[in-house]
Structure formats: C-alpha cells, structure tokens
C-alpha cells in the first residue's frame, strides 16, 4: 500500500506539471455538450430525455483524450523499464496510473456534469442519479482505458487504435450510466443500474490492473 501511495503521488505530480491533458479533457467535455443542443434543437421537452445520454457519451470521449499518454512518458524516458524491475510491480503501477487519471480527469468531469445537466433542463430529482452514475462509472473508464493505453503503447496512430479497442468496452458503462439518469427522470428505481455499475467497478478494480500489466510486458 505504501508503494501504491507513492506511485499515485508521483503520477499526480507528473499530471499536474503537465496539466494540459486534464484541462483539454474538461474543455472538450463542456464544448461538446454545449454544441449538441444547436444540432438537435432546443425543445424543452426533448432536452431532458437526451441530456443524460449526451453527457455520458461526451464524458466517454473526453476521458479518452489523455489515455494515450498514460504510459507514453515513462516509456520514452526509460522509467517504465526501471519500474518493471522494481519490487512494486507493473500491476501496482497500472492501478496508480488509473487512479491518477481519474483524480485529474474523472473528478473534473464529475464536477462539470451537474452544471451541464442544467443546460439540458434535467430535473433536480435526477441530479443524484447523474452524480452517482458518474462516480461509479468514471473510474471504470480510467481502469479499462489503461488496458488500451498499454496495448497501443508505441504504436503508430495509437490514438485511433486506442479508440477502436476501448470504445466497445465502454458501451455497458454508457448504457447503465445513462439508464440510471433516464430512470430517475421517469420516476423509476435506479438501484439496479447503480448496482450493475458497482459490479463493473469491482470487476475492473480486480482485473484491469493485472490485464494492463500483462499488456505492458509484451
């Protein structure tokens, strides 16, 4: 646990010094969500119905913007080889990278999402579902995204390949995340969707770091 904490602190320091990836993700998230009503119309009855889905789709895309660089800097300067030989292990490194990615990107998306929900006239009774689904879902994006980042490390046009690999894996998160918001708007119970997202998160925590480590060893 001490090694994990030190690695998370290291990754947060690197992310904060770089800074631009997280900022670009949030700016993209806000701009893309703001642009959608111009394309689909501003019907007050329609916007709440599509708002949850749009926010989740844009969040998926925004979270992917910085995934390509998750391991790239360590690979380029040789740090990844040293970490591979260290007692900490690549699985712990992968978990630390995912946690740092979520803290610098996912948390910002989580904060911005309720503000954007106001743009879509999402009812106040659905805000809890929005926050809960994002709180459970966005860490999954970082954990699963780490697998794609490891598989495409050093590849030409890695960003395109990363999107092709990861987007299909994000679909269940999108379905249940947006479904929780729609259920809250319609007055239906949202516990089933949140429980499924919680199960996905536990599975990702258990499996994704080690799958990422296996990909890094190749």
Where in the sequence are the language-model features?
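Hydrophobic alpha-helical transmembrane segments of multi-pass membrane transport/permease proteins
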Residues: 19-41, 56-59, 165-176, 202-207
């Amino acid at each position: 646990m001490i090694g994990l904490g030190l690695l998370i602190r290291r990754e947060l320091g690197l992310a904060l010094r770089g800074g631009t990836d997280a900022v670009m993700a949030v700016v993209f998230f806000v701009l893309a969500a703001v642009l959608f009503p111009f394309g689909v119309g501003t019907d007050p009855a329609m916007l709440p119905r599509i708002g949850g889905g749009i926010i989740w789709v844009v969040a998926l895309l925004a979270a992917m913007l910085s995934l390509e660089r998750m391991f790239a800097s360590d690979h380029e300067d040789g740090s990844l080889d040293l970490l591979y030989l260290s007692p900490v292990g690549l699985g712990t490194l992968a978990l630390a990278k995912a946690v740092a990615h979520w803290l610098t990107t996912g948390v910002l998306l989580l904060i911005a999402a309720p503000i954007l929900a106001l743009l879509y006239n999402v009812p106040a009774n659905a805000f809890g579902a929005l926050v809960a689904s994002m709180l459970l879902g966005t860490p999954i994006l970082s954990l699963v995204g780490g697998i794609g980042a490891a598989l495409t490390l050093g590849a030409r046009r890695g960003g395109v390949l990363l999107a092709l690999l990861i987007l299909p894996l994000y679909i269940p998160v999108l379905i249940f995340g947006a479904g929780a918001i729609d259920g809250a708007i319609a007055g239906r119970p949202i516990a089933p969707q949140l429980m499924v997202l919680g199960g996905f998160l536990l599975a990702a925590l258990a499996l994704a770091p080690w799958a990422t480590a296996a990909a890094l060893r190749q």
